[in-house]
Amino acid sequence: MLSPRRTKFRKQHRGRMKGVATRGNQIAFGRFALQAMEASWITSRQIEAGRRAMTRYARRGGKLWIKIFPDKPITMRPAETRMGSGKGAPEYWVAVVKPGRILYEMSGISETIARAAMRIAAYKMPIKTRFIVANLSKNPTND
């Protein structure tokens, strides 16, 4: 599962997810992509489950890029602990995802296989997603 090798600080504020993704919202490497339609935290386990599902379905064909990284630590307190005595220990890692963010990209396989693989991965995500295809026009005319 994905997690940072080291961080400057062990714990973070929860924060809030306002607006839409302004970065990472366009296809960069592959031909097909899975795009988030809602804002949410996506855990490293969910990212890994989606990756496994897609690679198993594609069967060694094509290439997969994971476009999100879980860099936010989520802390939890032990069960049945009294209030106070500080913030809990980091328990797992999440990626903060806003609407429009590309989660996965694929290429080297047919659209039908890519669509089916992404649908399986989408079931493992806690948000609504959509399948998008890249425009193949490499050099747009400047008219």
Swiss-Prot record:
Stored SUPFAM superfamilies: Ribosomal protein L16p/L10e
Keyword field: Chloroplast, Plastid, Ribonucleoprotein, Ribosomal protein
A UniProt-annotated Pfam family: Ribosomal_L16
Main location: plastid
GO molecular function: rRNA binding; structural constituent of ribosome
Keyword Ribonucleoprotein: yes
Alphabetized Gene3D superfamilies for the sequence: Ribosomal protein L10e/L16 (3.90.1170.10)
Cellular component per GO, a single term: mitochondrial large ribosomal subunit
Single GO BP term: mitochondrial translation
Compartmental location: Plastid, Chloroplast
Family label: Belongs to the universal ribosomal protein uL16 family.
Known partners and oligomeric status: Part of the 50S ribosomal subunit.
HAMAP family in alphabetical order: Ribosomal_uL16
Descriptive protein name: Large ribosomal subunit protein uL16c
Source organism (scientific name): Spirogyra maxima
Gene it is expressed from: rpl16
